[in-house]
Amino acid sequence: LYAKTTLQFRKTYKIPVKAISIPTNPEAIARGKQWVESQCTHCHGLDLSGELFLDDPALATMYAPNLTPGEGGTGAKFTDLDWVRALRHGIHPDGRSLVIMPSVEYTHFSDADLGDIIAYLKSLPGINKAQPKAIFRPVGRILVAAGAFGPIIQAEAIDHAAERPTTILAGVSLEYG
């Protein structure tokens, strides 16, 4: 069981990642901030420097990573393609699946929306805060192997070849609302 879950966590994926345009204008960064504040701060914290989000002596101890460019953060290490790979495909730059990160929820984002999110993440000030690695305990590993937590190996839950939606122009319309 330990070996099975360890193999799940260490399995690597080679997914072709399509480059997208990352804007730098203040309006795009502001839109990205809105997305990030509504989607990411629950686990990564209000300042996005990461925080403890699960601490159960039977299951696991898990920290969401620091997304800023500070020491211990991903922001200084991730390229634009790394951000796309992580957010849209649930895959770390080294090819391993992200664990728990709900990337499957971002597969419906347009390239423009994802670009805005990445633009905002790249604009963050650095916060020096390294987070410990996740620890899955025996009961947690049993539940992971049984699928009790759903698709925590995000790379296996995502249709990586799916068409991405087009951007809906803001304005009064049936599509926009």
How does the language model describe each region?
Residues 24-25, 29, 89, 95, ...:
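Interaction-mediating elements
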Residues 32, 37-46, 83, 117, ...:
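The canonical Cys-X-X-Cys-His
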Residues 1-3, 79-92, 105-131:
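C-terminal capping alpha-helices of c-type cytochrome domains
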Residues 1-11:
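N-terminal type II signal-anchor transmembrane helix
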Residues 49, 91-96, 123-132, 168-174:
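Inter-heme linker and motif-flanking segments adjacent to c-type heme-binding CXXCH motifs
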Residues 12-36, 147-177:
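Electrostatic cytochrome c docking/interface patches
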Residues 43-49, 88-89, 102, 106, ...:
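Detector for the c-type heme attachment site
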Residues 33, 47-85, 97-110, 135-148, ...:
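Gly/Gly-Pro-rich "capping" loops immediately C-terminal to redox-active cysteine motifs
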